[in-house]
């Protein structure tokens, strides 16, 4: 089979490699679609801790396909079944795993990160992934290219679940990249009264406007605070999602939030510059809640898959 194989920083080769052999409890999936995200780019550039020097591996952790081969003990996943493969597995017995947060397990594994992934014609699904419920059936009506977005969309779902958004609330999304667009679309589907998107990159701002996802503001050309106050009856944003790895965005969120507002620092900062300066009195006197989420659990992937299948959010 053909596969894109990582050999080192900026060295990704399309090679003819053997089709994986499966063992007891494992599955072989024929890949229909595998999407690329920022994690894959960090891997490619040699900036991922799970790809140390000397690693030779097939990346790709956002994978959709059909069951090509299943062991005799895998009656729940017959040959031909279309599935999304949730990438993250935990140890299965730590506190994080048993409370549904296997993405936070200290001993996690992930397809395409710690084992060969989906940038290939076939991918082997480890027995642990099958046992922990990571193989999610998808309907025939769902485009494989859309289903492959289940994992990043699950990260978005996890982020918004932490914010406990209520219908009618004003939502500000800072950053209109793919993740920011997903956040804006999901917020609308969940009943946000107003969605405002802040984006300085012209192409991304134009795309957000074409998608009609809300009021799009270029903070370099407009006063974001003034626009937000106009759209919120001078209250500020009930929900702020910082979907950009920017220090200024995190710092300004506290000022832009309404009283009792909730903020999610969704985009991580560069590891060599991880600190920000904040006015803690704004947190105290406005009773703000600041949270963050990272990656997604298997449960988040199931919920994201159900939302995609429902058609409520067009990805």
Language-model regions, residue ranges each:
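NAD(P)H dinucleotide-binding glycine-rich loop of Rossmann-like/cofactor-binding domains
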Residues: 91-174
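Glycine-centered, small-residue-biased loops immediately flanking beta-strands
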Residues: 169, 261-262
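Glycine-rich beta-strand-centered segment in the early N-terminal region that forms part
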Residues: 20-34, 48-95, 136-139
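N-terminal glycine-rich cofactor-binding segment
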Residues: 5-21, 38-69, 84-85, 102-113
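Helix-to-beta-strand junctions that scaffold the AdoMet/dcAdoMet cofactor pocket
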Residues: 257-258
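Acidic carboxylate diad motif detector
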Residues: 266-267
């Amino acid at each position: 089979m053909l596969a894109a194989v990582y050999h080192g920083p900026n060295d990704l080769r399309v090679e003819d490699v053997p089709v994986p052999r499966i063992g007891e409890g494992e599955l072989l999936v024929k890949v229909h679609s595998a999407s690329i995200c920022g994690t894959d780019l960090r891997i490619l550039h040699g900036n991922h801790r799970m790809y140390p020097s000397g690693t030779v591996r097939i990346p790709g952790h956002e994978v959709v396909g059909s069951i090509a081969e299943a062991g005799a003990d895998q009656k729940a996943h017959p040959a031909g079944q279309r599935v999304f493969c949730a990438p993250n597995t935990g140890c299965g017995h730590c506190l994080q795993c048993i409370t549904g947060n296997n993405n936070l397990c200290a001993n996690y594994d992930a397809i395409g990160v710690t084992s060969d992934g989906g940038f290939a014609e076939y991918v082997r699904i480890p027995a642990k992934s099958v046992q922990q419920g990571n193989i999610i059936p998808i309907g025939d009506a769902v485009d494989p290219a859309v289903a492959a977005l289940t994992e990043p969309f699950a990260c978005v779902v996890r982020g918004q679940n932490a914010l406990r958004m209520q219908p009618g609330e004003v939502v500000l999304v800072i950053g209109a990249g793919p993740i920011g667009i997903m956040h804006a679309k999901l917020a609308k589907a969940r009943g946000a009264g107003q969605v405002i998107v802040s984006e300085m990159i012209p192409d991304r701002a134009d795309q957000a406007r074409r998608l009609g996802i809300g009021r799009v503001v270029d903070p370099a050309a407009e006063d974001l605070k003034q626009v937000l106050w106009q759209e919120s009856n001078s209250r500020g944003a009930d929900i702020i999602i910082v979907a950009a790895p920017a220090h200024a965005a995190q710092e300004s969120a506290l000022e832009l939030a309404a009283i009792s507002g909730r903020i999610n620092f969704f985009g991580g900062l560069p590891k060599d510059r991880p600190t920000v300066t904040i006015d803690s009195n704004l947190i105290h006197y406005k009773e703000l809640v600041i949270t963050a989420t990272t990656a997604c659990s298997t449960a988040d992937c199931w919920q994201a898959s159900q939302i995609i299948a429902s058609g409520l959010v067009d990805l």
